[in-house]
Structure formats: structure tokens, C-alpha cells
Amino acid sequence: MTFFAYGPHSTLSGSGVTVPAVGSITNAPKLTFTIESTNDAAKMTDFVVAKNDASATQDRTHANSASGVTFTFRHVLSRLTFEAKPSVELSTTTGAKGTTYVMVRTAKILQSSSPKFYKSGVLDCADESWSGKVTATGDYDITKVLALTDEKAIVNTPADHTSNKYDAVKLTSNTTPITLFTSNEYLFLIPETAKTGTGTTSAGDVTIRFDYDIVTVDTALGKGYAITHHTTDAKLPAGALKQGVAYKYTIEFGINEVKILTPAVENWGSEAPGNITV
């Protein structure tokens, strides 16, 4: 007998997993997965599936039934996180003049330049393959996963901030990147290919637009600093979005452009068996 399992169980605002109607499944189920649809990347969830080893012999007598059915869950999405640094070492001179910062303010996946950014797809639990992928129809705001802090102590003129705050990720060192995302926050995206495939074929199949400021402290100026605003698009390199792969990208922010460097592949945890009582 074959059992299938998946997680997460619940859905949120039409997001997550949709299971076929009871009685309509004759073979392995096909599950529809939709990414978080309220445009809140902080609510994105991982998606894992498993099936038991039907060829394995298990003692199903009453005395041993509490042991449950053994499953090995596997990640079927792609996981992305980002760290960032300035493209050059910025001046960190202390005092009245000279300190410069890159302030990352907002970010979004740019739908018009992201043909491989999917809002939904269908996973076949028989072989964990994807089909029926639907391209997103709008930009996807990921600002809520940025590790923003209030930098009003630096940018303190009302015209340069909103709601009496200046929220940004502050970058200073070219040698030491810092994480752009809040701890334990990730993007979970529908993959382009299996783990053994090639991933996306072209740079920019997924493109992220960043709004950022370059701020230089200068007490000789009326407001104590000079600020320039920038909006630039960063293209994920080819080879992204393999199923079950966790990527860590380093982004370089410059005066006129943003570059995403070759990613590192992170450990996404072991695919260790676990028991579920059925």
C-alpha cells in the first residue's frame, strides 16, 4: 500500500496547497501549489512531499501500529536568500564629513522581466515533477523580508523619509557582505527544472528591482548629509531555480548598477526519514 504526505497542511488566502477533491484521485495525487498571494513575502512557505516505501515490510499488527508509516520528506521548491555589499569600499571616516552608506529601501520581483517567476504550478506526487506552471501577472513585493532598521539618526529630514522613519538595510563594507533578509526568512519559488536539470537558461529569467539611496554625511550641508536615490534591476544568473536547491546570492550595489554574483548553494537540511501515524 502506498501513502503520500505533504506539508504545509493549511492554506492562507488562496495560497499554499490545494488537494484534489475526495474520490477524484485514482493514482498518485497531483497537488496545486500557489505562492503567497497577499503580496507578503514574509508569509511564503516551504513545500515538502513524501511517499512511503511500498516495497518495505512493516509490522502492522495492533501492538506495533503506533509506529506509523515511515516517510522521507523532500523539498520541491527552490529557496533563495541574499546578502549584499557596496561595489567599492566606502569611506568610513568618522567626524563631520566623509562617511558614506548604501541604504537599501525596497525590493520586488519584477514581473515584466521575469518570465520564469511562477505564481502556481501542479506537482505530481508520483515522480515529484512540475507541470501547469502559471507565470505571475504582477510584481511581487519582497520588502517585508528585508532586514530593515530605522536609520533616522542619519537620514533625518522629513522629505527623505516617511511615517517619521527611514527604514533601510545599511551597507558599508565591500569586504564583508551582510544579510539582506531578516533571520530565517527566505523566498520559496516554484522551480524551473529538477535538481538534476540546468535551472533557468538565461540571466534575468527572474529579475529583482531594488530601490536604494547613497547617503554621504556632510555637516556643511543644511540637513547634514547628501542623498541620491536609485532604482536598479538585478538579474539572477542562469542556472537558478533548480528543485530542492537552496541558493545564497551576493549582490553588489553600485552608483549606477546592481550585480548579482555567482551564488553559493546552501545546505537545506537532511532529508531524514520521519514517522507519521496514519
Residue ranges of predicted features:
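Short, low-hydrophobicity acidic/polar segments
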Residues: 1-114, 144-166, 170-173, 177-180, ...
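Exposed, polar/acidic Ser/Thr-rich sequence context and nearby capping/turn residues
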Residues: 88, 176, 194, 198-271, ...
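Generic recognition of long tandem-repeat/solenoid scaffolds
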Residues: 71, 142, 186-188
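Short Pro-Gly-centered beta-turn/loop motif in secreted/extracellular proteins
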Residues: 1-2, 9, 180-205
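Predominantly extracellular/luminal regions of secreted and cell-surface proteins
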Residues: 109-113, 132-133, 137
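Conserved small-residue
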Residues: 131, 139-145
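Short aromatic-acidic-glycine turn motif
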Residues: 110-128
